Amino acid sequence: MSLIHPIQAVVSNRSGELIFAVLKNVIIAYRYDQTNGKYLEMGKWEDQFSRDEMIKIAVVKEQARQLAENEEKGIKKSKTNEGNTIEKKHDAKIPVPGPGAPPIYSQIRNLMISNDETMLLACADSDKSVLVFKIETLNNDNCLKLIKRQPFPKRPNAITITEDDKTVIIADKFGDVYSMLIESPVIENIDEEFEPILGHVSMLTGVLSTTNNGMKFVMTSDRDEHIKISHFPQSYIVDKWLFGHKEFVSSICIPSWNSNILVSAGGDHGIFLWDWIKGEKLDEFDFTDLVLPYINENHLAPDRFQNEENDLKEFAVSKLVSLPNNPYFAFFVEATKLLIILEVDQSTYKMKLLQKIVLPYYITFISTFSDDKTMGFNISLDNRESGDKDFVKFIALDTTSNTFSIKEEQSDEFNTSIVNSFSKEDSIVKVELDEVYPLYNIISLKKHGEHYS
């Protein structure tokens, strides 16, 4: 029996009125109508890019390069008996994965909204591109207008946008960072025309853009436990490194209520709070005891790294977010149902547990909403066993009691809208249980003995 694919990511504008979600290779947009409490579909975009076509272009390009190289070396072409050159005319062969090869997924990643809330950004695995959509709220047919699709040499792992919303900064899986002006023309010859603005020697996992005293900075995190702070756009000037992590860093954020603070998390079993201006670690919050009751068989280490008892479990923070205008952070450990909310004492910069919330299914993504009326978190869930229920939960702060709670009625309305949008059996996001895209990739960043040899 087919099911609607779980939501991989969900983000909203500050008021929470506009919601954008990713299901498989589809982005869908909704508007919350406060008069009747319903969610109205505002637009939809499906990534229809053909990976085969991209591979074919690469094969043709390589064939042309080899022919040119052969001519340069003086290698003779095949000729007829009359001495005429035989032109080989055939289509480029597209490599086909052999038996047992892992499936290829056309994921959409890194969903985010620009600071002025007029653009939606994402990354497409199909052609390793950054997608820029204009959000046309007055367009009743489809509010998502693709205005730029820029492929990159390697797959983007993380993106951010500068405060003026003019430049996207891209960190890829091979350790390179690029910048892209949104209004610049699309670059076709990406291997020759794109130059990294900075680099690491390992896979990049996060990137941020910020300013301090009129100076611009870009912050990057990687698999090698590093956080690097560089000037921007003079990114060859390294301001400092933040050392303290012993495992990979998977998530970094800067709170809007104090831009001198940076919070980081990953394979270590703690949340790190930094004064990045001074390069000092201010505090570390150990969450081990909080999450241990929620660690399960999904966290068993790979067989080749298991202990003799076969009970070694490994876990890591998947994503960490800061609630605007309030000294709160929220995070979750990959493949768990537990959302942990921390509060920061702004006089001592010490973190303490504010609240734990247990969700009905494993959390896959978290983002925030916050304006003068309401604030809280958008949570997407791995609901594959739910019978097409509980795709998303909205969690809001009650300022009177200073506690967070799930907005069940509003969450149910959104989930109903998802079902209505994708209920047809031929829907692109309908899959079998074993066809669900991989949702838990963070712990694969962990290094074992083989990585240090």
Swiss-Prot record:
One of its GO terms (cellular component) is tRNA (m7G46) methyltransferase complex. It comes from the Eukaryota. Pathway: tRNA modification; N(7)-methylguanine-tRNA biosynthesis. The keyword Repeat applies. SMART domains: WD40 (SM00320). Residues 69-99 are annotated as: Disordered. InterPro entries: Trm82, WD40/YVTN_repeat-like_dom_sf, WD40_repeat_dom_sf, WD40_rpt. The keyword Signal does not apply. Its main location: nucleus. Keywords: Nucleus, Repeat, tRNA processing, WD repeat. GO terms for biological process: tRNA (guanine-N7)-methylation. WD repeats lie at residues 103-143, 244-286. PANTHER family: TRNA (GUANINE-N(7)-)-METHYLTRANSFERASE NON-CATALYTIC SUBUNIT WDR4 (PTHR16288:SF0), WD40 REPEAT PROTEIN 4 (PTHR16288). Required for the formation of N(7)-methylguanine at position 46 (m7G46) in tRNA. In the complex, it is required to stabilize and induce conformational changes of the catalytic subunit. HAMAP family: TRM82 (MF_03056). Forms a heterodimer with the catalytic subunit TRM8. This is tRNA (guanine-N(7)-)-methyltransferase non-catalytic subunit TRM82. It comes from Vanderwaltozyma polyspora (strain ATCC 22028 / DSM 70294 / BCRC 21397 / CBS 2163 / NBRC 10782 / NRRL Y-8283 / UCD 57-17) (Kluyveromyces polysporus). The gene is TRM82.
